[in-house]
Regions:
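Sec-dependent N-terminal signal peptides
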Residues: 4-14
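Amphipathic, charged alpha-helical segments and their helix-to-coil junctions
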Residues: 19-165
Length: 165
């Protein structure tokens, strides 16, 4: 059994060398940035960001108003219990503002990932189709290439032709 395993391992490199490797690379990010779906996604993200910024500004204005009222109240030598109550309101509002800021950033990130996923899947499917149609052994993302030989084929233009309208 051990001899059979060693024989298979010994001849494996020869069988791999006998196959012609057809290599290609693609700049999928460049194509994604030019797709109409990506531009639609960016508009949705910008609209959502604008909405969140509007809400955030309202909260900040409310905080500034409460702070100003508190400062005015301090000048009148108001009862200590009232001052403590207002100070607590301001602290709670500051916490709400910080939570809103954090949550809105997370929601924005989540929405962007949600909208980008089908675009990336479409690009991946199209790259697979091109690879099968043209008989490529491997297709690499251009970002990971340290070296490319003259025999490697750039499929970016083909991918653009199929996806960018």
């Amino acid at each position: 059994m051990k001899k059979i395993f060693l024989a298979i391992i010994a001849f494996l490199p020869l069988s791999l060398m006998a196959q012609e490797l057809k290599l290609a690379y693609v700049n999928a990010n460049e194509v994604i940035m030019q797709m109409s779906e990506t531009q639609d996604m960016q508009k949705q993200i910008t609209d959502l960001q604008t909405m969140y910024e509007g809400e955030y500004m309202k909260l900040l204005e409310e905080g500034q108003k409460k702070m100003k009222e508190f400062e005015e109240l301090q000048k009148t030598n108001a009862d200590q219990a009232i001052l403590q109550s207002r100070a607590e309101e301001i602290r709670n509002l500051e916490q709400r503002i910080e939570m809103f800021r954090t949550n809105s950033q997370e929601q924005l990130q989540k929405k962007q990932e949600e909208l980008l996923k089908p675009i990336q899947e479409k690009v991946s499917r199209t790259i697979n189709e091109i690879g099968i149609e043209k008989g490529f052994t491997y297709i690499f993302p251009v970002e990971v290439l340290l070296f490319k030989s003259s025999s490697a084929v750039d499929l970016t233009a083909e991918l653009k032709k199929r996806l960018v309208k």
